[in-house]
Amino acid sequence: MGRFKIRAVDGPHDFTKFTETMKRIVLMGATSGIGLALAERLAADGHRIGVAGRKTEVMRELQKRYPEQIVYSRIDVTDAEAPRKLHDLIERLGGMDVYFHIAGIGFTNEALETDRELLTMQTNVVGFTRMVDTAFRYFRDHGGRGHIGAITSVAGTKGIAQIAAYSASKRFQQTYLTALEQLARRQRLQIRFTDIRPGWIRTPLLDADQEYPMSMTLGYAVPRIHRAMVSGRRVATVDWRWRLLTAVWRLIPDALWVRMRIPISTIASEAQTRRNETAAEAPLKRLEGPAPTASQKGPDAKPAVATADSTAKPKV
């Protein structure tokens, strides 16, 4: 990611730096992988977190670990009732300064099984739009300022055959965030936008029996995602290798791109599969440990994230 620094945003989008005060942050999709690790890190930083997802037991354990920082709600972004539940969560949180959308799904689907393609779109396009729009309207109606962020993907750079619906849905998310930023400027709203585009991250999203090129562990990726959230960068690609690769991808004409075979994964050894399975559960295993003491909490606490040598499962 390179050297980290916070940059001021001039004009109507200038507002208090993320790290200077406690923030009320809603994490949509924070019951596994990136979202869960990020929730732990932000709670340890002293922020108040509204955790939303589908795994109630995970959220309950997270609240036990950080009882003063965490409130939670079971929310499925594909449910029409999700916006109402989000507003209820915001009320219990005491308001919202930051909305961060992590919820997503994806399949390797060369057979083009329609149910899988539509489920991906229902979650990553319809659900994403439903929740991000709700957050935008909330900020518009409550002072006209806030921060909307999302985990999109490097897969949104180009259409990728094996993950057609996934790559298309991520391109939609990136374009939609740009459109909302333009809308915020037209309406003179102080809403900031962050589009975080990771490469492969070892999370439970994909199969443990596969090896993915240039994959990253949660312990490596989450601090970089955290930096991107609090920095002034509009778009952040994680990490530098993927920044270089996607820069090359953009230079390739579509007429040539469609003739290329883009490798997604290879079969992992049995030993590596076991390591992947173990590491994918790392954030959940941490919740089974003892709760942190008061001295471990607050802005000076050491972030609770996976170690850099852990190997959890990839997300594009």
Describe every region a protein language model picked out.
Residues N109-Q122:
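Short alpha-helical oligomerization interface
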Residues I102-T108:
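Conserved NAD(P)H cofactor-binding loop of Rossmann-fold oxidoreductase domains
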Residues T31-S32:
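Conserved glycine-rich cofactor-binding loop
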Residues S153:
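Residue(s) in the substrate-gating loop at a strand-loop-helix junction
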Residues V132, S169:
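Active-site helix of classical SDR
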